[in-house]
Amino acid sequence: YPDVVWLDEVLPGQACTTQRIMNAIPDPDKSILVTACDNAVLYDANKFMSLVNDVNNDIIVWSYRNNYTTYYDPEKYSWLELDGDKVTKVNVKEFKGGDPLDQHAIVGTMFFRNKRVYLKSLAGLYERNSTTNGEFYIDNLLNDAIDLGYNVKNFEVEHYICWGTPDDLETYKYWQRFFDQVDWHPYDYKTDYFTN
C-alpha cells in the first residue's frame, strides 16, 4: 500500500492525525471525506451527492437522530446546532439539553470541499488551542470553519449503526442473528459484507 500514511507516534487528536494525511495529498483542490471506523450508516447517496455537487457547500457533516446509543450518556457525543440544514455551532462532548433522540449527533463523517478548507480551519483550532479531553477533535475544528465563514451543512443519515463500544458491537450482533432468523426480513447473514 504505497499511499498509506504511517505514523511513528501518537498524535494529540484526530485533527492532527488527519493533518498528516492532508499534507500527503498533492492536489489542493481535491475533495476529502474523513470518517470514523467504529460505525456504519444507511444513507441516501443521491441526497448526499446533491450536497456535494453544490459548490457553495464547503463542509458537509453527517449526523443522525433517534438512536439510543446517545440516550444514556449524551456527553460522549458531539451535537449540532442548526438553522435549517446549516450548521451554526458544534457542541463537542457537551449536551445542551432536550431529548437526545431529537437532537443531531455527529456520525464522525465529514466532507471537505478541499484541503485548504480543512487546513485553514485547523489553523484556527490550533490558534485557539481548542481541545476536548486533551485532544484536538475534528468536531472542534467545525466551529473554526463556521467562524471563518465557511458554509457548513448537515446531512442526516437514514440509520446509524454504532460499534464504538463492546456493548454496541454485541447489540449489533444480536440484531444480526435476530433478522437472519425471521422470515419476514430480507437480511441474510451469509451475504452480509461484515460477516464474510
Feature roles, as predicted:
Residues 1-82:
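Conserved beta-loop-beta/alpha segment of the NTase-like Rossmann-fold superfamily
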Residues 5-8, 12, 109, 160-163:
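Short N-terminal micro-motifs specific to bacterial/archaeal maturation
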Residues 86-161, 167-170, 174-190:
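Catalytic-core segments of class I nucleotidyltransferases/pyrophosphorylases
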Residues 192-196:
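Domain-scale signature associated with acetyltransferase and cell-envelope carbohydrate enzymes
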